[in-house]
Amino acid sequence: AGENIEAPIVIGDGSWLGQNVSVIAGVTIGAGCMIAAGAVVVSDCEPNGLYAGVPARRIKDLGE
């Protein structure tokens, strides 16, 4: 059923992940991010943003 992909997931300081969030191998979530419940994170998230959706997209800047 395909090959295994192993890569670290990095979650920055002060980030929050909602319930049932999925993060794909190798993704970095920047500091101060909020990931909405049920989101699927398939690419890196820039710091201080609100991300939601499938796939997750930046929907709001949270400031510093």
Question: Where do the language-model regions lie?
Answer:
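Flexible, glycine/small-residue-enriched loop-and-beta-strand segment within the central core
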Residues: 1-27, 54-55, 60-63
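Short acidic capping loops at alpha-helix termini that bridge into adjacent secondary structure
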Residues: 13, 31-32, 47
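Short, surface-exposed helix/turn micro-motifs that flank interaction/cofactor sites
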Residues: 16, 34-36, 52
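Beta-rich strand-turn-strand
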Residues: 20-34, 39-42
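Acidic, glycine-centered active-site loop in nucleotide-sugar glycosyltransferases
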Residues: 45-47, 52-55
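Short amphipathic alpha-helical segments
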Residues: 47, 63-64
